[in-house]
Amino acid sequence: SIQAVYVPADDISDPAVVAIFSYLDASLVLSRKIAEKGIYPAIDPLRSYSISLDKDIVGERHFRIAAKVKELFQKYEELSHIISILGIDELSRNDRLIAKRAERLRRFLTQPLFTTSSFNNREGVYVTREQTLEGCERILNGELDNVDPDTLYMRGAIL
């Protein structure tokens, strides 16, 4: 079944929320902070999880790419505090690369969904799991480092 859980004041560490989450096989955590940036669906990839994200279920490649995506977003979250104070130009070359790839990845993971087309005036697009994995892998590997991140927003697949 699918359950909606109200999280008081967006506090995922609330004892009642923690108790409920322990019974769930998967959790998609929606974030106001991500939604404020215009990223939809506004799923927080660092706080969302699924017990089905297992090598034996999704395969080695999918598992590896998902782990690298989470690792990149985690590093970016750590850098975001520095970026908000000093700006991205004050980061080391490697940290700037991490931040820029994370932004590309965040934009790529936006979805032009069929169910939201009447709200955002964007035609829905079907994207296969393989296309999503391929796009994530290309961003992680730096193949799209010279691509404007805005071209990845609500795009669907990278062809």
Model-flagged regions — what are they?
Residues 1-159:
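Conserved catalytic/coupling modules of large nucleotide/cofactor-utilizing molecular machines
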